[in-house]
Curated annotation (Swiss-Prot):
Regulation: The formation of the proteasomal ATPase PAN-20S proteasome complex, via the docking of the C-termini of PAN into the intersubunit pockets in the alpha-rings, triggers opening of the gate for substrate entry. Interconversion between the open-gate and close-gate conformations leads to a dynamic regulation of the 20S proteasome proteolysis activity.
GO cellular component: cytoplasm; proteasome core complex, beta-subunit complex
Reaction it catalyzes: Cleavage of peptide bonds with very broad specificity
Protein name listed in UniProt: Proteasome subunit beta 1
Gene that encodes the chain: psmB1
Nucleus as UniProt keyword: no
Primary subcellular site in the record, as a coarse category: cytoplasm
Active-site positions on this chain: 11
Role noted for this protein: Component of the proteasome core, a large protease complex with broad specificity involved in protein degradation.
Record note on quaternary structure: The 20S proteasome core is composed of 14 alpha and 14 beta subunits that assemble into four stacked heptameric rings, resulting in a barrel-shaped structure. The two inner rings, each composed of seven catalytic beta subunits, are sandwiched by two outer rings, each composed of seven alpha subunits. The catalytic chamber with the active sites is on the inside of the barrel. Has a gated structure, the ends of the cylinder being occluded by the N-termini of the alpha-subunits. Is capped at one or both ends by the proteasome regulatory ATPase, PAN.
């Protein structure tokens, strides 16, 4: 990866709740100002068997939080004997971001997971949390959200959700210069976390 990870920005992320799972998707481009510094950046990360996070913002801040969350998830399992809930992970992220206001994380996070049902949370850089049925974050979010709002329906199947999330990121790729290089797609269902083949076109 070229450039400083702390200065590189990741751009458009998307989350969709389906009947039988949650889909998280993101583009693969990182930029430094107007320069493309990487075409293979990962912006969606597994935290535990049924928990994942997607980040739009400074790559270094995103990776730092992911390391912290993975450690906290392991500690929670060791203490409690089970995986934390999706809401508990969202609350943890919110507390970390809120407590770091004087040295903030420059990123916006989507938390997706499955406990008793599929859940999706959006968390801004100040720690504000909202539960969503669908959401987009990052520089291309307005283009992705327009497509999501027009095409999302409650109770859609997982395959439909995957297709919708990919199309939403592609809509951002077409219109936003900071979004590009294909789409990373992850599905979290009752069976667990599954990363699909990247969509490169």
């Amino acid at each position: 990866m070229n450039g400083s990870p702390s200065a590189m920005k990741g751009t458009t992320t998307v989350g969709v709740v389906c009947r039988d799972g949650v889909v998280l998707a993101a583009d693969r481009r990182a930029t430094l100002g107007n320069m493309v510094t990487s075409k293979e950046v990962t912006k969606v990360f597994q935290i535990d068997d049924h928990l994942a996070i997607a980040g739009a913002g400074l790559v270094g801040d995103i990776l730092s939080l992911v390391r912290l969350l993975r450690a906290e998830a392991k500690l929670y399992r060791a203490k409690v004997g089970r995986e934390m809930s999706v809401k508990a992970l969202a609350t943890l992220v919110s507390n970390v971001l809120h407590g770091s206001r004087h040295l903030p994380y420059f990123a916006w996070f989507l938390i997706g997971g499955y406990d008793v049902k599929p859940r999706l949370y959006s968390i801004d850089a100040a720690g504000g949390v909202t539960e969503e049925r669908f959401i987009a974050a990052g520089s291309g979010m307005e283009f992705a959200l327009a497509l999501l709002e027009e095409n999302f329906s409650d109770g859609m199947g997982l395959d439909e959700g995957i297709d919708l999330a990919v199309r939403a990121v592609k809509a951002a790729i077409r219109r936003d210069v900071y979004t590009g290089e294909g789409v990373t797609v992850v599905a979290i269902t009752k069976e667990g976390y599954r990363e699909l083949e990247p969509v490169l076109k």
